Regions:
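Gram-negative bacterial Sec-dependent N-terminal signal peptides
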Residues: 1-22
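Short, compositionally biased P/S/T/A/G/V-rich stretches that sit at domain boundaries
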Residues: 23-38
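Aromatic/hydrophobic beta-strand junction motif of beta-rich domains
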Residues: 40-49
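A post-motif C-terminal structural segment
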Residues: 42, 70-73, 85, 135-187, ...
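Solvent-exposed serine/threonine-rich low-complexity stretches and specific carbohydrate-binding patches
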Residues: 60-81
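Short, hydrophobic beta-strand segments
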Residues: 76-94, 113-117
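Short, aromatic- and glycine-rich surface loops/edge beta-strands on solvent-exposed regions
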Residues: 95-105
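Extracytoplasmic mature domains of secreted/periplasmic and thylakoid-lumen proteins
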Residues: 193-263, 268-269, 276
Length: 581
């Protein structure tokens, strides 16, 4: 036995000696699908900081510089780190298949790229991309129940996003994790490249500074550079937040809000609407979050933008034929539909005239549609996700209904034009499910006593819906039983949080771990739940579940079966014929 162990150790040592050092890393990564003529940064990182004479990089067997038609830049010990780097910023390639090989001594790394062309003439004049942030299947189901009603096993109507001819399952994972965040998930839609958690418009390399990582061009930048299209970005989050920022940003850190504001200014989408005004304000302005002397409110005005800070100002700008609008309606996130329409909580006392996503969508289309070259519009219902993080499903579902109403606005605009591609897709899912209904008339003193499953899951008795499809009463005796599969220590009340967004957990006495919010635990039926997340978690998390995409218009027929999230970019780019040498 000892001899066998010695032999195995000897073989293992010999194998280790024969294996190459840590492999070189090539960006873009293996299996990248790159739009012909789009701009991207080419980078190869070599471990152990070799000299340029000790490495070689080829593309299809030829020197990289020859293929790109430009010299590359080699940096030994980049940023003083223990690696060297070969760079080419702003590269582009004609359509074709490419094999990239990076050699360092006996070590070699290989990646393959597909550079795809887009056919002319362009099929779509306009593209409207709706992103329901965190909108899981249960969100759509619950929205349909609340907005349309249910009777004898059938819904009494369809959602606007359901009534679309094309559908696909979309996988959302990033390069570094099975479960994505909103940054690299939205980045996949707007660039066609995979990336890592927290990244926007970049691959995640070893660079120390967040703005120095290898960049890839966004669809908004492409539309501005290659066409005369107008571009719009609409959200009810802070405009610098991950999803809207994915249209313009290039940073390894999604929280680089001040830099992202500058990136919005550099790209200059024609219509920009959301919250997050403090990062636009000059440092000397009370409430500013900027650390420099820039006043981006003034800069946008000088660039010809009208500023709107209320719904009334937004509508007046649209009615006046404004073509460039900067709409900043809250210092933080815009309040969701549940608070705007029903509970009247959130920040309404401070910002009483905030537009919702539906109103923003209508105003944006009115301002963009006059462009003879068409428009590209991204609309996000951001708080579907934020409320699911808070385990506040009623607010999350109200914002799903709101997104659906915005989709109806777009469908009404598209009508019979046959020139507008409309896509509705989440960026990722949450682990949320409907397991039955709670009925206060069921016997028992515990929340689980009130739960009806299977034959006992009788329909809820929410109040009548208003003209927009929102129930006018939700704190009723029979309610949907909606549960989340990820949660910190918390208490489930089984009822809507009418006094403000739910706070599932708070800091414990040690200041490190989180404990259940006793405010929720004091209710008569509250069920205390031991969390299933790490102890420092204070909210729910995303899931790796596939999400449902629905679409209509020119190019939508390409959505079928299962696709990676990067495919959404490809369909939009092909519909707009954005490729070219």
């Amino acid at each position: 036995m000892q001899a066998q162990r010695l032999l195995m150790m000897t073989m293992a040592g010999a194998l280790a000696a024969a294996m190459p050092a840590t492999a070189q890393t090539i960006y873009p990564i293996n299996r990248a699908e790159i739009l012909e003529g789009s701009h991207f940064d080419f980078k190869v990182e070599f471990p152990n900081a070799p000299a340029s004479a000790d490495v070689n990089v080829t593309i299809n067997g030829k020197p990289a510089a020859e293929i790109f038609g430009r010299p590359t830049n080699f940096i030994q010990s980049e940023e003083g780190q223990k690696h060297s780097a070969l760079w080419l910023r702003g590269a582009s390639l004609p359509a074709g298949s490419y094999t990239v090989e990076a050699t360092q001594g006996t070590s070699k790394s290989t990646v393959k790229w597909e550079v795809f062309a887009t056919a002319q003439p362009r099929r779509a004049k306009n593209v409207i991309l709706f992103i329901g942030d965190g909108m899981s299947v249960a969100n759509r189901t619950a929205a349909r129940i609340l907005a349309k009603g249910w009777e004898e096993g059938r819904y009494n109507g369809e959602l606007a996003m359901d009534d679309m001819p094309n559908m696909a399952l979309i996988s959302t994972s990033g390069t570094d994790s099975i479960v994505t965040d909103s940054a690299n998930a939205a980045h996949a839609y707007t660039t066609g490249h995979k990336s890592c958690v927290n990244a926007l418009g970049v691959y995640c390399a070893k660079n120390a500074l967040t703005l120095d990582h290898p960049k890839v061009e966004t669809i908004a930048e492409l539309a501005k550079r290659r066409t005369g299209m107008a571009v719009g970005v609409v959200t009810n989050s802070e405009i610098e937040d991950a999803t809207p920022a994915s249209m313009v940003a290039h940073t390894r850190r999604r929280s680089d809000y001040n830099d992202i504001v500058k990136m919005f200014y550099d790209v200059k989408p024609d219509v920009i609407m959301g919250g997050g005004s403090p990062n636009f304000l000059a440092k000397t302005t009370p409430g500013s979050k900027r650390t420099d002397g820039e006043d981006f409110i003034a800069k946008f005005k000088e660039a010809g933008y009208t500023l709107a800070t209320t719904k009334a100002e937004m509508n007046a700008a649209a009615a006046a034929g404004t073509k460039k609008l900067l709409g900043l309606y809250n210092t933080g996130n815009i309040d969701g539909a549940f608070d705007l329409r029903l509970a009247k909580k959130g920040t309404l006392s401070k910002f009483p005239d905030q537009p919702d996503v539906v109103e923003q969508t209508k105003a944006a289309i009115d301002m963009l549609k006059g462009n003879p070259e068409g428009f590209l519009l991204m609309v996000e219902s951001a708080r579907i996700d934020k409320y699911s993080h808070s385990l506040d499903w009623e607010r999350s579902v109200f914002d799903t209904i709101m997104l659906d109403n915005a989709v109806k606005v777009a469908k009404d605009f598209a009508g019979d034009r046959n020139d507008t591609l409309i896509i509705v897709v989440p960026d990722h899912a949450h682990p949320i499910s409907i397991i039955g209904t709670y009925d206060d008339d069921r016997p028992g003193q515990l929340l689980r006593d009130k739960l009806g499953v299977y034959a006992d899951s009788v329909p809820p008795n929410y109040g009548p819906v208003d003209a927009e499809g929102y129930p006018t009463k939700v704190d009723t005796s029979r309610r949907l039983a909606v549960v989340y599969g990820s949660y910190p220590d918390t208490c489930d009340t089984g009822r809507p949080a009418m006094d403000g967004e739910r706070v599932p957990a708070v800091k414990g006495p040690d200041g490190k771990t989180n404990i259940a919010n006793e405010k929720d635990c004091s209710g008569p039926l509250a069920a205390r739940k031991t969390g299933n997340l790490p102890f420092d978690a204070n909210s729910g998390v995303h899931s790796a579940d596939d999400v449902i995409l629905t679409a209509m218009g020119p190019g939508a027929e390409k959505f079928r079966g299962h696709k990676p999230n990067t495919y959404v970019f490809r369909v939009m780019a092909e519909a707009l014929a954005l490729g070219g040498k």
